[in-house]
UniProtKB/Swiss-Prot annotation:
Keyword Ligase: yes
Signal peptide: none
Protein name according to UniProt: Histidine--tRNA ligase
Gene name per UniProt: hisS
Protein localization: Cytoplasm
Enzyme Commission number(s) from the entry: 6.1.1.21
Any one Pfam family match given in the protein's UniProt record, by short name: HGTP_anticodon
Keyword Nucleus: no
Broadest EC class assigned to this enzyme: ligase
PANTHER family from the UniProt entry: HISTIDINE--TRNA LIGASE, MITOCHONDRIAL-RELATED, HISTIDYL-TRNA SYNTHETASE
HAMAP family membership: His_tRNA_synth, HisZ
Amino acid sequence: MDISRPRGTRDFLFAEMRNRKEVEGVLRRTFETYGYHEIKTPIFEELKLFTVKSGEEVVNQIYHFTDKGGRELALRPELTAPVARLYMNEMQKKPKPIKMYYFGSCFRYERPQAGRFRQFWQFGCELIGGRSPLAEAEVISLASESLHELGLDGFEVHIGHLGILRGILGREEIPSELQDRIMGVIDKGDVEELEALLGEVEVSGESRELLMKLIGTQGGPEVLDDVEEYLGGYSESLEALEEFRELVETLHYFGVDDYHVNLGIARGLDYYTGIVFEIYVPELGAQKQICGGGTYNLVETFGGERVESTGFAFGFDRLMNALGMDEENMRMVDVFVIPIQDSTVPEAIRITQELRAAGVSADLEVSGRKLRKALSHADNLGARFAVLTGEREIQDGKVTVKDMERNSQETLPRDEMVDKIKGRC
């Protein structure tokens, strides 16, 4: 029988899991310093949760099924909608803003390729009830600081505002559903398809030219002066531009000054309403985007109160690629304990348990191998020390400790052994 891993999924072995847990730990600590607390949602939800405002491309990629009770369910393709559902079910009466973060796997039926998988992980946060330039700036600051804490260099923060683009479409009286479709094409970056769609929905020549000019606008905060000149009498877009200026000013107080204004960011999810941002690592090429987020109002879309929120998520797998952490030379255990004779197994067990109780990673030779093979196994594990328990040493109240890195050994008093090893690990 040929049993293999499903296409588009991965197995993670010891070294890679160690690295992923290390990065996860840094992100958890950083998010918690900003006052966020962790939540968990189910891996599957009702299908309709994702078909209302997730965007055409995401909807087409959903893994969905009908359960034995006739319910239409789906494996989650992203985590913002489940968080909004959790808020509606459990937290509407709690004081706001509410800060929560999450880490979990998502599923999309995508064509597997470099950097894209059908099961992938997101690490993100949501600030529920927090739409303001101050809230948005703090969220962007958290994303940037998290990457600095991980020691990642060369990343770029790109910030846009959907209100500027939607203000133009609103003046053209384009329905929101068609606006969502246009935003999806802008997000794909397909200029020819965008021009064709704008012509199809009869956007005026003036607005069409303005949209094309805006989505190509990138640079420092100074380009917002040019944008103001472009917008002229588009009042809703000018209001959004003023919000953008307030965000720029507030980011400075958070120490976030290195970013790009990029009005071509539209995001692939239809629920974003205001500020949007993405973080790129250019050296990753086509898969350079490692983070995306912005301001949205999903709760009202789902039938709840109007509560604007801001959040983002790291594509955890791409983040790991960007960090390029070494997977070799992993130490699987600090100490490997080897009983020399069968009669010394009880003492070897006691030593192993004492080391573990002291917080030292310890493993025990349980296969009955000869000393030479047991030491070879300790070396393969990357053990720092091997502890040898022989009958004579036990009678004398001592143990032999072999330094695997220096290829030397010494005899230590039994009652001092744990403290001395702990001090060297």
